[in-house]
């Protein structure tokens, strides 16, 4: 990192929403901006909370399972309290530690309660992807854990959720014939369910959705590639992890965003 402060990492004056912003507008903004979180502020720019794509989609999903409401769903119904904030004078290590300790992906930067900016896990990954930090050019192969049992593409979404809970992972590879064809995470599952049209048979239709309809097809890494390349892949495809295969395209394991961020934390002072 070129500086000792957060200035090279923070997105200043980030897009923000109000409590009255509708769910449709929230989802449109998130898709257009390629983000999964938006800060909620009052008229004076004071931070009220954070709204996430996951929370919005879950609320939409609940509405689809019951009779349609007259009033549109708004941010005030899904806004979450802020687990942590930081000031503009903080050091990068403080911000990254807060993100990892709280298991969150975005950290508001405040001054006197007013929103100045946002720093995210992707901002730190991007810094790591430049390959200038110690360890960022290590080979992927030295950082692989024993692979978790992957999913088959014809598994149901419920089976995928159960598998994630059982192994304690928030993402799993989807493998066919020993070769990975994609990755699935909780947000992918919720997105797939919300794509189902409303109607009397919707709940039954949702239960038949297969992992192949929810997964993201992504390029795999080779064991000899560098960790900074893994970070770049995660940023480009907005992934929580990267899949690693051998030359025969056989599944070897996964490398998570949190693993790379943990390495980065140990290097920061």
Residue ranges and their predicted role:
Residues 16-35, 41, 85-103, 110, ...:
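The conserved cystathionine-beta-synthase
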Residues 170-171, 182, 186-187:
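Conserved active-site beta-strand-loop modules that form the wall/rim of enzyme catalytic pockets
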Residues 1-13, 52-83, 96, 100, ...:
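Tandem CBS (Bateman) regulatory domains
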